[in-house]
C-alpha cells in the first residue's frame, strides 16, 4: 500500500481517533497504530473513540497494510469497571488486536489469562530496572516514565541487554517512548486538577484541559492581582524530538510513540511522515558513516521542523530527555500551527482512468489557482495538493461557490471526501 519499509527495527506508532486518521497513518508509513474504544482509555473524552463494533474492521485494514494494532485500556479501573474491561479484552482477542496497552494490574492479569499481549503504559511510572523486571512477567513492551533523561533510558536499556530481561513471550523487552505531541503539566498524566475543579477525572480519560486556560495570581486578603510573565502557567509546550532522534534511538528506544488521538488526519500524516523519514535516515547513517550524511540530516531537520509547524502544536520543546528539569510553557491558547484548514467542499466524483477528482465548492466564496488544498476521507486519509489546471466546463483560474470543478490528483480520492483550503497564518 505504501513504499515505506515496515520491517524496520524501529517502530513508528501513530495515534488514531478516526478512520481518516487510520488511513493517514498507514499511508504515511506507520508501523503500528493505537486507539481506544468505549470509556476505559486515557482519551475517552477528548478524542473520537471507536466502539467494539469497529475492532474487526480496524484489524482487517491494518493487517492488509502490515500494520500492528494496539488497544488502550489504560485508565484507573474501579470495581464497577471490571466487567466492561473483560468484555473489551475479550473483543480485542476475538478481533485479533496485537496488544493491549495497560496500566492497571487487573487489566494485565486478565489479558495474560486470555493470552493477549500487554504493553505497559507510561501511567505505570516505570523509572528503573527493578520495576521493569517485575512487570516484565506481564508484558513485552514498556513506555518508561516521561521525566527520564536519555542517560537514564540508556542505562535501563543496557540492563535489559546485560541482565537478559525478557518479556512474557520470551523476547528482550522493548523500550517505547513518546517522541512527539502534547505533554501534561503533571508530566505523566497523573493529574487531579480536572477532578478537583470539575469532577471530571483525567485518570479516567475525562480530562477537561483546564490547565490550558489563562490564569491570574490573586491575593485573597486584598484582592490584588499579580501580573505574571506568562498567564498560561500550567500549559506546557508540545514535545518534539526529531532534531535529536538519533540520541533517542542510540539510547535504546525502539518504539517511537506519537501523541495525538484527538488530532486530525493531516496532523497524523505529517508527523508520521517526518519521523518515518528521520528513522530511515538514522538507519542509513548506521550503515554508511559518511560525513556528508551529517550535513544532509541537518538540512532535513530544518525541513521537518517547518513541516511539523504547519499542523497543530502549542510551540515545541525537548521534554526532559536532554536533562532539562523545568518545563517550558506556552504563551498562547490553542494551536500555533502555521497553517489552518478551512472547510471548502466535498469530492463528488473520481475518475480513476484519468486520475481526475471532481469537487463541489460549497463553503467558501472562491478558490484560486495556486491555493493549497487538503482532502480527507475514511480511505483517503489526508491528501495535500495545490490547485492546478482547474476546470469547470472549461479551464479556469477561479472557482466560485456552488460550482463543480475538477483537478488532476496523484492519488485516488473518493466520493464524499472533504475538501479544505489550507491558509497560511502569520
Residue ranges and their predicted role:
Residues 21, 106-107:
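Alpha-helix capping/helix-boundary segments
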Residues 90, 109-114, 132-134:
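Hydrophobic, small-residue-rich alpha-helical packing segments that form membrane-like cores
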Residues 48-54, 83-88:
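Charged helix-capping and loop-helix junction motifs
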Residues 1-28, 32-44, 56-59, 65-75, ...:
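Surface-exposed amphipathic alpha-helical tracts and adjacent flexible/coil segments at the periphery
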Amino acid at each position: 500500500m505504501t513504499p515505506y519499509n515496515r520491517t524496520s527495527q524501529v517502530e513508528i506508532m501513530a495515534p488514531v481517533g478516526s478512520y481518516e486518521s487510520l488511513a493517514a497513518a498507514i499511508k504515511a508509513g506507520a508501523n503500528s497504530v493505537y486507539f481506544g474504544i468505549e470509556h476505559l482509555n486515557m482519551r475517552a473524552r477528548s478524542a473520537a473513540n471507536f466502539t467494539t463494533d469497529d475492532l474487526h474492521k480496524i484489524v482487517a485494514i491494518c493487517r492488509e497494510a502490515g500494520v500492528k494494532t494496539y488497544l488502550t485500556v489504560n485508565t484507573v479501573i474501579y470495581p464497577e469497571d471490571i466487567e466492561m474491561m473483560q468484555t473489551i479484552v475479550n473483543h480485542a482477542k476475538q478481533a485479533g488486536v496485537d496488544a493491549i496497552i495497560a496500566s492497571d494490574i487487573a487489566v494485565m492479569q486478565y489479558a495474560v489469562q486470555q493470552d493477549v499481549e500487554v504493553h505497559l503504559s507510561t501511567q505505570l511510572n516505570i523509572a528503573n530496572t527493578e520495576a521493569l523486571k517485575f512487570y516484565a512477567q506481564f508484558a513485552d513492551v514498556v513506555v518508561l516514565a516521561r521525566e527520564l533523561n536519555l542517560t537514564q533510558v540508556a542505562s535501563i536499556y543496557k540492563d535489559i541487554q546485560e541482565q537478559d530481561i525478557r518479556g512474557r513471550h520470551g523476547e528482550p523487552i522493548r523500550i517505547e517512548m513518546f517522541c512527539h505531541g502534547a505533554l501534561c503539566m503533571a508530566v505523566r498524566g497523573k493529574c487531579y486538577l480536572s477532578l478537583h475543579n470539575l469532577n471530571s477525572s483525567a485518570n479516567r480519560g475525562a480530562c477537561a484541559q483546564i490547565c490550558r486556560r489563562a490564569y491570574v495570581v490573586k491575593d485573597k486578603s486584598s484582592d490584588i492581582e499579580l501580573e505574571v510573565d506568562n498567564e498560561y502557567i500550567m500549559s506546557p509546550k508540545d514535545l518534539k524530538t526529531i532534531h535529536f532522534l538519533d540520541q533517542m534511538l542510540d539510547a535504546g528506544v525502539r518504539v517511537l510513540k506519537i501523541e495525538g488521538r484527538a488530532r486530525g488526519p493531516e496532523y497524523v500524516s505529517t508527523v508520521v511522515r517526518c519521523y518515518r523519514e528521520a528513522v530511515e535516515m538514522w538507519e542509513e547513517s548506521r550503515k554508511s558513516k559518511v560525513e556528508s550524511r551529517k550535513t544532509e540530516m541537518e538540512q532535513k531537520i530544518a525541513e521537518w521542523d517547518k513541516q511539523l509547524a504547519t499542523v497543530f502544536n502549542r510551540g515545541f520543546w525537548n521534554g526532559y530527555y536532554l536533562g532539562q528539569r523545568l518545563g517550558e510553557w506556552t504563551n498562547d491558547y490553542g494551536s500555533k500551527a502555521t497553517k489552518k484548514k478551512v472547510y471548502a467542499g466535498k469530492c463528488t466524483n473520481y475518475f480513476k482512468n484519468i486520475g481526475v477528482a471532481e469537487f463541489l465548492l460549497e463553503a467558501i466564496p472562491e478558490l484560486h489557482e495556486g491555493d493549497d488544498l487538503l482532502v480527507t476521507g475514511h480511505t483517503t486519509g489526508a491528501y495535500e495538493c495545490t490547485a492546478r489546471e482547474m476546470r469547470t466546463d472549461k479551464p479556469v483560474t477561479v472557482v466560485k461557490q456552488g460550482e463543480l470543478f475538477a483537478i488532476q490528483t496523484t492519488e485516488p480520492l473518493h466520493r464524499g471526501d472533504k475538501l479544505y483550503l489550507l491558509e497560511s497564518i502569520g
